[in-house]
Swiss-Prot record:
HAMAP family: BioB. This is Biotin synthase. Gene3D superfamilies: Aldolase class I. It comes from Bacillus cereus (strain AH187). The gene is bioB. The lineage of its organism: Bacteria, Bacillati, Bacillota, Bacilli, Bacillales. Pfam families: BATS, Radical_SAM.
Amino acid sequence: MKQVQTKRDWKKLAYDVVEEKVITKEDAIAILEADDTEILEIMNAAYIIRHHHFGKKVKLNMIINTKSGLCPEDCGYCSQSIISEAPIDKYAWLTQEKIVEGAHEAIRRKAGTYCIVASGRRPTDKEVNHVIGAVKEIRETTDLKICCCLGFLNEDQAGRLAEAGVHRYNHNLNTHANNYESICSTHTYDDRVDTVQKAKQAGISPCSGAIFGMGETIEERAEIAFELQRIDADSIPCNFLVAVKGTPLEGQKELTPVECLKVLAMMRFVNPTKEIRISGGREINLRSVQPIGLFAANSIFVGDYLTTAGQEPTADWGMIEDLGFEIEECAL
């Protein structure tokens, strides 16, 4: 006779997390390996944790791509890399005026955080000064929180960004350390961890996450969440691979919507007090179950991503309202 596997009590696990009991890697793997029919129970349990720490608030973030393409790195997932043949817009730095204009567009989209992103391995000091000039004007004229994502930083650059008023610095780990060489050869996993630590040491809130669906195992997927816990990332963007034509990963099978939901739930269980953001690939990978993702996550991007389109801001606002949730404006 076939043995019936005992179902996990996901609610009990959630209340254990709320009571600050330690979740194990085995617990995280169990979430990822659970039968798809359990997904609503898992998301309901994740919501217990999410609601305890964040209530019904949803934080909106907006990206501006201030420098597109022209990157010397060979990241296999990225349409902006030197080896990509994807047909994207390529341009050098936007003017400070354009960057500041983008901040006011972020406000119109009800975003509380404005993310200034530039392609490339690392910024020059001149480029950092260019960003700082825009940041200072934005700080003087808005209440937005500012996040930067400019590549690898040295200690001096991190310090100057902090002094200028940058609240958060994004530098994703992208994938598990064991999987890193399969997606990039021009820098290492440790290089990425180093920049996250430099930003934190400078007094900037660290933002770091991953792109799921790049060939990592279930166990590695869980270990990524614990690694983000270890480096104490305050904000964790969960991206889901969009297999862009013209990139080395164009043939990679994308995750199913339920697999994406399990990742979001697992991330909430492992990092209960952190901002969990549904990021790149949200519309393409989660599709019609996007709203369910917000029962684990408490943050999304509004508008377009770096080189892929997002849905209209009104659709995001409507989704949040339909759930009975509320937009958290201008709060980090």
